Amino acid sequence: MKFVLLFGVLLVTLFSYSSAEMLDDFDQADEDELLSLIEKEEARAKECTPRFYDCSHDRNSCCRSELFKDVCTCFYPEGGDNEVCTCQQPKHLKYMEKAVDKAKKFGGKIKKWFG
């Protein structure tokens, strides 16, 4: 019985050590991947197309606003055959950003009152 108990404790110890090593490896891989994604996003942010500028060359190059990414919207001007594309923010996202800003301001006032 002592042998089985000793073997069980040894097995649990080895298993916990190996799982801790695997978790450390996964954490390091996730951290490296996250850093590379952040670097790519920063590089892309420098090349983005500002709001109301032409985005016909790359329809996914629109800049981000505070919360949401602008959308490349294409249309045909009246009396013209050429398609015009510009980066624009959809109205519903604009209203959502305004609501979030007002909620932040209200939260700041509450902190002043009770904080």
Swiss-Prot record:
InterPro entries: Spider_toxin_CSTX_knottin, Spider_toxin_CSTX_Knottin_CS. Residues 21-44 form a propeptide. Keywords: Disulfide bond, Knottin, Secreted, Signal, Toxin. It comes from the Eukaryota. It is found in: Secreted. Pfam families: Toxin_35 (PF10530). GO terms for molecular function: toxin activity. GO terms for cellular component: extracellular region. Disulfide bonds join 48-63, 55-72, 62-87, 74-85. The keyword Secreted applies. Its main location: secreted. Residues 1-20 form the signal peptide. The keyword Disulfide bond applies. Expressed by the venom gland. The presence of a 'disulfide through disulfide knot' structurally defines this protein as a knottin. Belongs to the neurotoxin 19 (CSTX) family. 01 subfamily. This is U3-lycotoxin-Ls1f.
